[in-house]
Structures are given as C-alpha cells and as structure tokens.
Design a protein with these regions (language model features):
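Phosphoinositide-binding peripheral membrane targeting modules
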Residues: 21-37, 41-93
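Low-complexity intrinsically disordered segments
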Residues: 78, 84-118
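Charged, low-complexity, helix/coiled-coil-prone segments
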Residues: 4-17, 47-62, 115
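Hydrophobic transmembrane alpha-helix bundles
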Residues: 16, 29, 66-73, 97-98, ...
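Anionic N-terminal interaction surfaces
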Residues: 1-38, 90, 101-103, 118
Length: 118
C-alpha cells in the first residue's frame, strides 16, 4: 500500500509541479507530498514520486480512470484530524492511500472521482 501525507495545491500550479501532462490535459485537483505529487486530471490520475526524500530518480505512474475499481473518503470530524482518501487501482490488492492534512476540502475530489466513474 502506498501511503502519502499530502497538502492540497492549487490546480493552476500543477504545470510547474510536473512536466508529464499532455497537450490539452486539464488538472482538476493537485496534491503535493514530501516525496512527490499526485494530479487528478480530466483524463487520468498521475502519481510522480521518489522512494525517499534523498532519491534523485522519480517514478511516474499513470492510471486512466477506467482502472479505478472504487474509492472511499473519510473526512475528519474532530478539529485537527486528517481526512483520508483510498483509491483501488487496477489489479493492485492495496489502495493508494492519501492522508490529507487538517482543513483540506476533499469534496471537489470526491465529486471528480464520482463523475469519472459514473
């Protein structure tokens, strides 16, 4: 299971976060982690990350929305608690697990995933 502690980033900043976008691809949600970035575009989920902070090489994974089996979002109710997103991709047994810092609004991401899976 890949677990990433993330902060939300403005979608407009995504172009400077990664050079892996194709012409005409629009970023709807972007999250940054200490070791990488995860982008939710109109076409796919793009994950670019290093194994650890000192690693120079970056591994990039691209998942079309059709490979998303299902997702779950758990929002923190208590002040200062984290929200989590789990996304089951392709034939991977364990989900991609994003832990968002307190105050992160995950409703736009939930709406995007629901629209893409409908």
């Amino acid at each position: 299971m890949r677990i990433l502690d993330v902060d939300q980033s403005p979608s407009a900043d995504a172009d400077r976060l990664t050079a892996h976008l194709v012409s005409g691809e629009t970023v709807h949600a972007a999250f940054v982690a200490p070791t990488g970035v995860i982008l939710f575009t109109d076409r796919r989920i793009l994950l670019a990350q290093r194994e650890h902070l000192l690693e120079v090489r970056i591994e990039t994974s691209s998942y079309p929305y059709r490979s998303v089996r299902h997702f779950s979002i758990q929002e923190g109710e208590a002040a200062g608690s984290r929200s989590t997103v789990r996304i089951w991709l392709g034939d991977e047994a364990q989900p991609l697990h994003l832990r968002a810092n307190p105050g992160t609004d995950l409703r736009p991401l939930q709406r995007l995933l629901a629209e893409q899976l409908a």
